[in-house]
Amino acid sequence: MEKIFIFFVLFIYTYSLEPQPLNDLDIDISKFEVASKTNQIILVIPPEYNTTNATLYFYVKNDNKWVKHTETDAYIGRNGLGKLKEGDKKTPVGVYKFNRYFGINPNPGTELPYIQVNESHYWDGDSKSKNYNTLVNYDIYKDFNTFDSEHLIDYNPGYEYALNIDYNKEQTPYKGAGIFLHCFTNNTYTAGCVAIKNTTLEHLYTIINEDCHIIIDTKENMTRYYYNHSLLLYINIKMFMFIFFLLLL
């Protein structure tokens, strides 16, 4: 009985070492693993996995302090979070960067390599194409299925301004393509992208730099992206196994 009690106490102790889920949005941005790599972090936080509404927060580091610059309503995938494959209408969770900047409207004032799309531009959604999940110009490259791709200029409202979230940057076939941060459409959901108000994205475009990171998940899961989460979890498992075998002696 004494061994069982000791085992229980030590189990509770080791579990307590792991960062616990947040109960509010008072998030310590400096604890994110990517906080040392950037001075800009976007959080997209829905209230739960199976919802289409979310809140986008944009944080900027000034004088070594993280300050909330923007908070705005957002929409995510029609089937919520947890994208796994092409066409599942879900928004991916995790930490990402932006790797393409484009829109139907003229450059809003960014120094990023912005492309104002025209009739020739597509987002290649053909899993058999060598340029899968990239922006292509049909005048230059035609070896892809346009039916499986997005003719970008047709998405208005929506793609007045857009940034590609680098989900599936490895271009794994059928894993999914074209996950953007873009403007609101006429729907209260997306096909897997993140959508915010047109004027808000236009403003953010003038601030966002190439090192900006975006983290997408529920608030309860935000500690997963803290710099010490993986290490603490590893230590906890090792300690638990050590204690377990020690008590068996």
Where in this protein do the model-derived segments appear?
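C-terminal GPI-anchoring signal of eukaryotic secretory precursors
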Residues: 227-237
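Cell wall/extracellular polymer interaction/catalysis modules
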Residues: 20-191, 201-224
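Conserved "landmark" site that anchors the functional core of diverse proteins
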Residues: 197
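Boundary at the C-terminal end of the N-terminal hydrophobic targeting segment
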Residues: 14-19
